[in-house]
């Protein structure tokens, strides 16, 4: 990949696209491209590592099991997710390309 905006899928792609940008012991950086996808009903991420995520382009709604309100993320917003903090993607803008930069790090 030549850049964060390179090789983007069409806005009508049925699956999210995950691209690993860098991997080192205790560190993984990936680009995630969503085009309207969200977490399956009832599914929660519960990851052993921390994750810092930046929304580069688009809109998304992120929900945490320990928060009553959903977080609406816009381009430029970021969140640091502690290990084992249950979370899910409730919504990404349908028909639009949403680009995430996710940094997974050992706790």
Feature annotation, model-predicted:
Residues 1-44:
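A short, N-terminal "cap"/entry segment at the start of jelly-roll beta-barrel domains
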Residues 45-47, 52-75:
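A short beta-strand-loop-beta hairpin characteristic of the jelly-roll/cupin
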Residues 74, 83-107:
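Ligand-binding loop in jelly-roll beta-barrel domains
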Residues 28, 61-63, 88, 99:
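General beta-strand recognition
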Residues 61, 69, 78-79, 83-89:
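Histidine-centered metal-chelating micro-motifs
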Residues 25, 48, 85:
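A generic "binding-loop/recognition-motif" signal
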Residues 26, 67, 94-96:
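Short strand-connecting beta-turns/loops that link adjacent beta-strands
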